[in-house]
Amino acid sequence: MKISKYILICSIILLLAGCNFGDSTEQKLSTILSEIYDLEADYRDVQEELADTESKEQANFQQMMELTKDQKEELTTMVEDTATLLKTRLALVEKEAASIKSTSESIKQISSLVSETKEASEKESLKEIETSLNERIKAYEEVTTNYNELANMQQELYKMLVDESADVTTIQEQVKEVNLHNELVQQSVQKFNDATIRVNEVKEEVLTSLQKDAK
């Protein structure tokens, strides 16, 4: 009996630093985007530890599935260790989520910049990057919702492994449900990564356009 890997990989990062083009609209936008990049430091910093924790938990689970309930003491110890790993990664995801959420106020500054800008083309460009950033946050919220739901299902599965009243069929059904929900998590992670790629593309297009207009 196997469980699919549920490693959360958000390897695409928001590369926003190093944009300096003088004053006016492009400089103000560059400053806002750099603020967003800095605010996401915690998001970037937890990725390696999160992946490592998930990998250890996955390895533990595979070992637990090879044990029988007759090996109760060993199984109980492994379940406790694995539950601790799960709690650790949820704390990391919470830190990651707080980092992403903290960018909301900076994104709102783009809306203010739209109001300040007189050029119609610049307004449209700014609205486009604001929209892409907000869509990225929305995509990340979907990731965390699905990820936390998956973690709850995994917690229930771990409890079943040491529950003498839980038969093999019940455990197999829970594994199936976990794997199905894991697919949903992977889909939402891909959606978030695609949204991040889109932000970076729009950012490059908009800043290049603003720089040309300023000449």
Where are these regions (language model features)?
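Short, solvent-exposed mixed-charge patches
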Residues: 213-215
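Immediate post-signal-peptide N-terminus of mature secreted/exported proteins
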Residues: 21-94
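Sec-dependent signal peptide recognition
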Residues: 2-10
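N-terminal hydrophobic targeting signals that begin at the initiator methionine
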Residues: 1-2, 20
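Primarily heptad-repeat coiled-coil rod domains in cytosolic scaffolding/tethering proteins
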Residues: 24-27, 31-34, 70, 77-84, ...
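Amphipathic alpha-helical coiled-coil segments
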Residues: 36-50, 89-96, 100, 140-143, ...
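C-terminal motif of bacterial Sec signal peptides marking the signal peptidase cleavage site
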Residues: 15-18
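Extended amphipathic alpha-helical interaction segments
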Residues: 96-178, 185, 197-209
